[in-house]
A protein has these predicted regions:
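Juxtamembrane intracellular "pre-TM" segments in multi-pass secondary transporters
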Residues: 1-7, 203-246
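Extracytoplasmic gate region of multi-pass secondary transporters
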Residues: 30-35, 241-293
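Cytoplasmic helix-loop-helix junction between adjacent transmembrane helices
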Residues: 116-153
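Helix-loop-helix hairpin linking two adjacent transmembrane segments in secondary transporters
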Residues: 150-201
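A membrane-interface helix-boundary motif in multi-pass transporters
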Residues: 170-183, 388-408
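C-terminal transmembrane helical hairpin of 12-TM major facilitator-type secondary transporters
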Residues: 302-352
Length: 428
């Protein structure tokens, strides 16, 4: 059967990164403007924390089944489904603002706002889909750099939007800002439709080529990683590997924490230090974009030093940053702590996904689903805990809340050490 295989590794990487970029921006859906909803709706600190974190709930949990779905389809279909759901949620948020904001947007609409936030967060779940899609395009020895580029560039979106949203608020207002976001998301979906291609094996299978022949021809085209199981089997294989759960714990700290802080930092900077929304957005962007960009060289570092060693070193940096934020009452030291956390979290995130294909080569999507899904759940779980510190201790609760990251960093260092022992024993 003569079937043409379209695309290339580079095109596959560009397509996946584009789709992830526009979907992942929903991490900053409410963070930069949460104070506006708090004022008009009369929300408590904990309610604000749940609002900014809710997109990450669906964005994390949906990564599990959709990440595993990649092992049967190659990623294109899951990507388009998630991005379309996110677009629907964004349109709903915009319509609610146009119809009710500010005078009629009362607290009784809070559940509806949470639902639309959850729907908008579906785009965040594209992360594990893209991880699998890119991993099937590239050979294992280039997974650190390719996945680092994918995740690092895609992760820039929340920080960029946290910086731009306060600017567009001044120019276009709240409704105009969200409308511009919707247009950008729609353009991103169209761009992914044109560029987001599956790896050769999946293209051949979709064209009706028998599995053995599709595998042989894909190998001739340079593909080295192949699925060997369906969705349930892929998740099952991954779940039976203890190393999967070590990566989940580490990723909960570094990537879940990254999402949590990207959503929480605008509130922290404005409420604790009294900064303007523009300055708070800029500082949040420095953290978020910094953690994202450093993920690219972090992937190359993991290729050279190994994922486990890179994870341990970067987690120590994260711990130091968290200690500074917990104990510092000064602005300068708090900024230093945030920068150190950005460096540590960004590099560790790259190290984790250098290790994902090593855990189960035959079920990359399953491992990526568990790690990306449950790990990213930290983005939903952590902000309400930090909000509870504020509710209990007032202003002093803002720095005290970072003790959560101190504990998580220590726990993750232990997990990384145990992971090193498990993988070393397997290869011995």
């Amino acid at each position: 059967m003569n079937v043409h295989v379209a695309g290339s590794r580079t095109r596959g990487l560009i397509g996946a990164t584009t789709g992830f970029f526009v979907g992942f921006a929903a991490v900053s859906l409410f963070g930069p403007v949460a104070h506006r909803f708090q004022e008009v709706m009369g929300l408590t600190p904990v309610m604000v924390a749940f609002l900014v974190a809710t997109p990450s709930l669906t964005g994390s949990l949906l990564r599990i089944p959709f990440g595993a779905w990649v092992d049967t389809t190659g990623g294109r279909k899951p990507f388009l489904v998630l991005l379309s759901l996110s677009l629907l949620g964004m349109v709903g948020v915009w319509a609610l603002i146009v119809a009710l904001y500010p005078d009629h947007l009362v607290v009784s609409f809070y559940p509806l706002l949470l639902f639309l936030a959850a729907l908008s967060g579906c785009g965040i779940a594209t992360f594990s889909v893209g991880i699998g899609q890119v991993a099937y395009w590239y050979p294992p020895e280039r997974h650190g750099s390719s996945l680092g580029a994918y995740a690092g560039l895609g992760n820039i979106a929340p920080g960029l939007f946290a910086f731009l949203l306060p600017i567009t608020l001044t120019a276009w207002g709240l409704a105009g800002s969200y409308l511009a976001w919707i247009i950008l998301l729609g353009a991103g979906i169209a761009a992914y439709w044109l560029t987001g291609l599956n790896a050769p094996f999946f293209q051949l299978r979709r064209a009706g080529v028998p599995e053995d022949e599709a595998r042989r021809r894909a190998e001739e085209l340079g593909q080295k990683v192949f699925p060997s199981a369906g969705i349930r089997a892929s998740l099952g294989i991954a779940a039976r590997r203890s190393a999967t759960w070590s990566l989940v714990g580490i990723y909960f700290t570094t990537f879940g924490g990254f999402i949590a802080l990207t959503a929480w930092f605008p509130t922290y900077w404005m409420s604790y230090f009294g900064l303007s929304i523009g300055t708070a957005g800029t500082l949040t962007a420095i953290y978020s974009v910094g953690a994202s960009v450093i993920r690219v060289p972090g992937g190359s570092l993991a290729d050279r030093l190994g994922g486990e060693a890179t994870a341990v070193g970067s987690l120590v940096v994260t711990l130091v940053g968290a200690l500074l934020l917990t104990s510092s009452p000064t602005f300068a030291l708090s900024v230093t702590g945030a920068v150190l956390m950005a460096i540590g979290m960004g590099i560790c995130n790259a190290a984790v996904f250098k290790l994902v294909p090593q855990v189960a080569k035959e079920a990359v999507g399953g491992v990526a689903g568990w790690v990306g899904g449950l790990g990213a759940f930290g983005g939903f779980a952590i902000p309400p805990i930090m909000g509870a510190f504020v509710s209990a201790r007032g202003q002093a609760g803002y720095p005290l809340g970072f003790v959560v990251f101190v504990a998580l960093a220590v726990f993750s260092i232990v997990l990384a050490w145990l992971l090193h022992r498990r993988l070393a024993a397997r290869t011995a």
